[in-house]
Design a protein with these regions (language model features):
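Conserved pre-ATP/AMP-binding loop-to-beta segment of ANL
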Residues: 19-21, 134, 155-180, 187, ...
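Conserved AMP-binding/adenylation subdomain of ANL enzymes
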Residues: 199-216, 223-322, 332, 357
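Structural core segment of the AMP-binding/adenylate-forming
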Residues: 2, 52-53, 80-152, 525-532
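Conserved ATP-binding/catalytic segment of the ANL
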Residues: 387-454, 471
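Conserved AMP-binding A3 loop
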Residues: 33-37, 176-202
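Conserved C-terminal "lid"/linker of ANL adenylate-forming enzymes
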Residues: 452, 477-479, 527-585
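Conserved AMP-binding/adenylate-forming core of the ANL superfamily
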Residues: 23-76, 93-98, 150, 195
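ANL superfamily adenylate-forming
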Residues: 117-172, 277-324
Length: 585
């Protein structure tokens, strides 16, 4: 079990392992190692830079970057000098970037490239901002070149008594970071997390995961997301190795090259893997895959218990099908983790029948972030696992999950009233999620704020229905709507590569995506998908109308949060005319 008093203690362990490889980065097609002492030297170099800038204990220092080795170096350096890290998503607009920099009162700001630097230039005045550092080479007005700073790091790799003493000055209850929640509406709120919040959650959330020294993981989820950062800390704390991948599009090649033991992703990535696997299976290959899935289903209980079935048929299916899926993850993975949004029972069962237990967890930024998780020591499909021991949990009268403990955040930055609203009178944090506990395993039903109440007074939980729809390879995203209406409808953003393959096989031609979704054959196909899902729903939950949209929903186009959750209000506003058509208005 990890036992650190602060994140600085974690870094002290990370930085004193000599020549041991702790991180990897890609240059061209080659993956290069970063040793413990190299990381130590680089963090020292940035810490000295921050001190030369006059950054004091408690000052806020912001950071925006893709996943590259500079990210943890800056993060650990900020913590080393007792400052507070403020990570920003790369997808923020200049206006959003400016809001967070002003709201946090950032004194310094690190950006990765000219694109983010240009956003800063367009973000408006930030009165507190005094210094900017840029990772990439180039000419940037009034900014420090970080490559020049890192050149000095080689001379700082040996343990330094004064620097190590500086690390120890930070106390557990000091603020470590302010994480601005992406949110689906309004201005983001800054979640204040202390060192104690983070290290206590690390200590208990990783117990049962059996992370080993030398275990590798590819860091590709945005590190401004609390879960991605949490796992990186956990791997560093257990003497593992992190390979930083700046571009998600390069993930397939990275998995083959790095061969990670640990794979963390949001549900959408798992859905994409499933859709890609099913999309390649035609004719005899599909027959074999269906047979293998049948064998997996027959031996599901054994796989759930972490056993390898002894059946000759299962072993044959493993050789022909399951092993190839595992090879797509690099062939060495032994732990698959899903978080950030619900994975859905259908996807969980599909992977299980392919011989893979996906450990689904649950949490939020405000809980540092893990509330519960499945592990090798406790796994139940369809749940988000058992609670971390440093959190208590209770259910409100309406089923809302409420938690209390050392992982719960210190409050929202400069928003005392907003903080009060998130807690009960007796001090329990209201998660906003509906759930239930069964033999210690937590299940999430839906987001309280997303529950749909029809005009007939019936409640519909949209997420489970959306999960069932997305289990079909032709569905990219789905938004179930119907609040205050007589019945529920669904807007579907197709999985366009799969749809185009289907169209070619079924004699459908169209000049563009908009024309494709308006084709009668295509619409009939999606109506049949919805009809199949409707058969598993209560009468009041059934989707009466289907609307197809002619574009993919993405983070960049604004319909999804960085953790791939639907921005429902954005979708409702963007497609209000189409929704009116569905309701015959």
């Amino acid at each position: 079990m990890l036992d650190f008093g602060t994140l600085n203690d974690l870094f002290a362990r990370l930085g004193h392992r000599g020549d041991a490889t702790v991180a990897m980065w890609r240059e061209g097609t080659e993956w290069k190692p970063i040793s413990s002492k190299q990381m130590y030297g680089r963090v020292r170099a940035v810490a000295e830079l921050l001190q030369s800038w006059g950054v004091q204990r408690g000052d806020r220092v912001a950071l925006v970057s893709e996943n590259r080795w500079e990210w943890p170096v800056i993060d650990f350096a900020i913590l080393a000098v007792g400052a507070v890290g403020v990570p920003l998503y790369q997808t923020l607009t200049p206006e959003q970037m400016g809001y967070i920099l002003r709201d946090s009162g950032a004194k310094a700001f690190f950006v990765s490239d000219k694109k983010q630097y240009a956003k800063l230039s367009a973000a408006g005045e930030v009165p507190t901002l005094e210094h900017v550092g840029v990772f990439d080479t180039g000419e940037f007005d009034n900014a420090t070149s970080m490559p020049a700073v890192f050149e000095k790091a080689a001379s700082l790799e040996e343990p330094d008594t004064a620097f190590d003493a500086l690390l120890k000055q930070t106390k557990a209850d000091e603020l470590a970071t302010i994480v601005y929640t992406s949110g689906t509406t309004g201005d983001p709120k800054g979640v204040m997390l202390t060192h104690r919040n983070l290290v206590d959650n690390l200590r208990f959330s990783t117990d049962g995961l059996h992370i080993k020294a030398g275990d590798k993981s590819i860091s590709f989820l945005p590190l401004s997301h609390a879960l991605a950062r949490h796992l990186d800390y956990a791997i560093y704390g257990n003497d593992g190795v992190i390979a930083y991948l700046p571009k998600f599009d390069d993930l397939v090649g990275a998995m083959k090259a790095v061969r990670p033991e640990i794979f963390l992703a949001v549900p959408r990535v798992y859905e994409k893997v499933r859709q890609g696997t099913e999309g390649k299976a035609h004719g005899f290959k599909k027959t074999i895959m269906d047979w293998a899935l049948g064998q997996g289903k027959a031996h599901r209980t054994e796989v759930m218990e972490g056993k390898t079935p002894g059946s000759l048929f299962w072993k044959l299916a493993n050789k022909l099908v399951y092993s190839r899926l595992k090879e797509a993850f690099g062939g060495h993975a032994r732990m698959w983790i899903s978080g950030g949004a619900p994975l859905g029972m259908d996807s969980s069962e599909w992977f299980l029948d392919m011989g893979i237990r996906v450990f689904e967890g649950y949490g939020m930024t405000e809980t540092s972030p893990v509330i519960s998780r499945n592990t090798f020591d406790g796994y139940r499909i369809g749940t988000v696992g058992k609670l971390v021991p440093n959190l208590e949990c209770r259910m409100a009268a309406d089923g809302e999950i409420e938690v209390k403990g050392t992982a719960v955040f210190a409050g929202y930055w400069q928003k005392e009233e907003a903080t009060k609203k998130e807690f009960t009178d007796d001090g329990w944090f209201k998660t906003g999620d509906i759930g239930k506990l069964d033999e210690g395993f937590l299940s999430i039903t839906d987001r309280k704020k997303e529950l749909i109440k029809t005009s007939g007074g019936k409640y519909i939980a949209p997420q489970p229905i959306e999960g069932k729809l997305k289990a079909d390879g032709l569905v990219g995203q789905a938004a179930v709507l119907g609040d205050t209406q007589k019945f529920a409808v669904v807007l579907i953003s197709p999985e366009f590569p799969a749809l185009k393959r289907w169209a070619a096989q079924n004699g459908v031609t169209a000049k563009d995506d908009a024309a494709l979704v308006n084709d009668p054959k295509v619409q009939a196909q999606y109506e049949s998908i919805v009809k199949k899902v409707n058969a598993s729903l209560e009468h009041h939950e059934t989707l009466k109308k289907v609307g197809l949209v002619g574009e993919e929903w993405t983070v960049d186009s604004g319909e999804l949060t960085p953790s791939m959750k639907l921005k429902r209000r954005v979708i409702v506003e963007k497609y209000k005319d189409k929704i009116k058509e569905l309701y015959g208005e």
